[in-house]
């Protein structure tokens, strides 16, 4: 299980779990500022790292992101540990995309999260504007905020 770092009060009415993007860790200046901003507004923020980023933290070697199945399984493990009650999931770029995908899966299983927030959604791979990554968003009923 990946380590989860919490900011904000345990008694908060809402927890926002955030995953990092493909190239920067959970404690990048962007992620720190976002988590601190949520905590300052009385919300609880939970951050974690996908396995490839945790390995990079251990040995300093840059790696590509894990396959989507590993990223989605990591998200599910984090959600199971935190609990779905009053939980919004999201993240930066790739982390938000994976959150939206797992939210769609959970919704279809009848165990949805409260919402999704994507901070810079990667609508298509770099240099491939014709290859959209949005099919699951077309039917997603979970409240979703995408900030570009």
What residues fall within each predicted segment?
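Serine-hydrolase catalytic machinery in alpha/beta-hydrolase-like enzymes
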Residues: 1-87
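Active-site signature of alpha/beta-hydrolase-fold catalytic machinery across serine-
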Residues: 33, 101-105
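Short beta-strand immediately N-terminal to the catalytic nucleophile in serine-hydrolase-like folds
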Residues: 89-91, 119
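Gly/Ala-rich beta-loop-alpha elbow adjacent to hydrolase catalytic centers
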Residues: 91-95, 99
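Hydrolases whose catalytic domains are alpha/beta-hydrolase-1, hotdog thioesterase
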Residues: 98-102, 127
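A conserved short beta-strand
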Residues: 110-123
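Charged helix-capping and loop-helix junction motifs
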Residues: 129-138
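Short beta-strand/loop motif that positions the catalytic acidic residue
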Residues: 140, 146-148
């Amino acid at each position: 299980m990946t380590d989860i770092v919490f900011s904000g009060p345990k008694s908060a009415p809402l927890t926002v779990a955030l995953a990092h993007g493909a190239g920067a860790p959970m404690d990048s200046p962007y992620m720190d500022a976002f988590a601190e901003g949520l905590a300052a507004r009385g919300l609880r923020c939970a951050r974690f790292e996908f396995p490839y980023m945790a390995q990079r933290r251990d040995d300093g070697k840059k790696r590509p992101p894990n396959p989507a199945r590993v990223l989605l399984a990591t998200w599910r493990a984090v959600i199971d540990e935190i609990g779905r009650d009053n939980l919004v999931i999201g993240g930066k770029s790739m982390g938000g995309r994976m959150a939206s995908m797992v939210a769609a899966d959970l919704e279809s299983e009848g165990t949805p999260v409260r919402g999704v927030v994507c901070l810079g959604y990667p609508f298509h791979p770099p240099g491939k504007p014709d290859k959209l990554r949005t099919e699951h968003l077309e039917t997603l009923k979970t409240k979703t905020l995408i900030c570009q």
